[in-house]
Swiss-Prot record:
Regions of compositional bias (Polar residues) in chain numbering: 87-102
DNA bind region: 19-46
PROSITE patterns: ZN2_CY6_FUNGAL_1, ZN2_CY6_FUNGAL_2
Classification via InterPro entries: Fun_TF (IPR021858), Zn2-C6_fun-type_DNA-bd_sf (IPR036864), Zn2Cys6_DnaBD (IPR001138)
Region named Disordered: 87-143
Main function: Transcription factor that specifically represses the expression of the gene cluster involved in the biosynthesis of beauvericin (BEA), a non-ribosomal cyclic hexadepsipeptide that shows antibiotic, antifungal, insecticidal, and cancer cell antiproliferative and antihaptotactic activity.
Biological process according to GO: positive regulation of transcription by RNA polymerase II
Gene ablation phenotype (knockout): Leads to elevated expression of BEA1, BEA2 and BEA3.
Alphabetical keyword list: DNA-binding, Metal-binding, Nucleus, Transcription, Transcription regulation, Zinc
Lineage: Eukaryota, Fungi, Dikarya, Ascomycota, Pezizomycotina
Gene responsible for this protein: BEA4
The name this protein goes by in its record: Beauvericin cluster-specific repressor BEA4
Amino acid sequence: MTDESKRCRTKKVKARTGCSTCKRRKVKCDEQLPGCKRCAKIGVECPGYHKPVKWSVKYERHLVNSSPTAGNSFSCFDSGAGNLSNLMQPKSNPGSVETQNHNDNEVQAPGPLTRGSSSSLSDAREHLEDTLEMQPPSTLNSEQLSTLCDDVQADEEFPCALNALHDDSLCLTSYIPTLQTSLILDHYFTTVCHFNSSFDSANNPFRSEVSRMMADSPLLFGCVLSMSAAHLYQGDKSSSCIPLEFQTEAMSHLSRTLSELPTRNECEVDDNRPMALVSREKILNVSDDLLLSIIFLGMTAAWHDVSATGLPHLHGSRQLFRSWISLNNLTDIEKRRKMTRTQIFVVSSMVYWEAMSSALFDQQYEGLSHLTMFCDPHPPALVQPCPWTGVATPIFVFLAKTLTLVRNNQALKSLWVFESGEIHRRALYGELLAKANSLEREILRYRLPSLALIEDIGDPCTTPDHLLAISRCYRMAALLELYSAFPEITRTGGRPDSAIDLDRGDEKTHLIMGLAFSILEILEKIPDDSGTISIQLLSLLIAGSVLGPVPPRGEDEGPKRLETLRLRTFVRQRIHKMYAAVRLGPIGNAMAILEEVWARMDMLPAIQNANSAISSFHWINIMSQKKLETMFG
């Protein structure tokens, strides 16, 4: 070929348009309508010629807020997503491609998920089935992980249309994960599922139920990515924006889903005023995955920011949970005894969330009435262990109610500033005491399941007796808090377990210290590698907070002082091992609260007894004073 012909030859311009099928095959697309000829030739449906764009959360926020139903009772989710969006700075994502239309402004944002064309559905399905496979934790070596990353690199080069990304009619198998998404999803199944449950095996609902549901729920999929990213990048300041992006995306998706729920107004009896009727908005369709998504976002809010409590999510989820109960006819005791595994998982997760949150804010005792139906004093014939509540979900209902009464009692102390405050305080205290007496009887009446009736979970590290021991600990923790706040109850002579053998001198002090010692001695017998270590934190905090005061060396070298010091050491070591295994900020807050409680108790004059020390320095008060509120679950 002559030089002149080379110069005359028209320069080929690389096409950046066309359907994604032709792009993947790296061939030129003729862009015919309704579909290109090459797709017709190979016998696939042409996906069309959408221009690739990058999604901006700020525009998504405006769309959500402009929804005709955005002003409903779930506006807290919209504001939460908006606040997170405002914290984010624009940052380009190397795994996405910018639009080539320079006449329009380029839209720049993270876009955690991308969707493949319809011709690549089988590839996406095969990839996700491999990723979601029920495999034990930490079984992927570095070579396998590298292969997993290589498999999705080619898919990152071809982002797809935005309207397909947020199409909830499409199942998860329509999505092709980016490299980053694949790493985060792998981290969920290899690490988060392992430490976020009291047991881990193929029976772990975080593996079995969640993976099954999120295959058809982009919302749940986004929430899983949010919590996994929060743990994966924990403490990595250079990558702190990544989990924030996934959290914002999940909250925006949640806001959008809530705004589309069908509702109707109904008149119901007010829980606080039995003679009054109130108009309430009833949700007509609440799915399991929607409830779990909100629970996951609320429970893991502190993974993103240790000071986050997740309470805005809790307040919104209660209405959804009540509607979910009604839709599933769970007010019928026979229906409750025949709940599916998914329903048991949802109920236990909601109850655990309520228990962990009840120490963080003041609420009316009647606000937890919707949980009472799940406190059947007679366990079913075969108990299915739950990731967070173990084998005794009712115990955590009792704990939630107990901590609510404790906070109510603490709030009464502020009435002294009023001239007639003491009169009102005594009247209100009498009401709380009556509720505390009734609650104590419920706790003592509840029968823990026998070891033989606990379903095998297939985890050699977490045996059924570990789960049963945790249930005993939390039952005693609830009683400890109840007796500490309402000492009059101790005169009834009730005892939670025959294993507790106490003197009858100072009823309150001996009973509380005896309960604390019993809790910690039970926890000592549970090995450090037990999966239950993930749900021990609040019991350690409650029992550890009454270990004192310890007089200075030389004043009292008796067995009580030595035992108190020994148990304090155990609490420190167990919490440190818990942090080493889980590596989440809220664990550090719990240890800081205990150290402050112990320091203040030990500074009391020697003439003051343990009773006054426990009353003066309750861990909830210290938590509030030091601004250490967080989710301890």
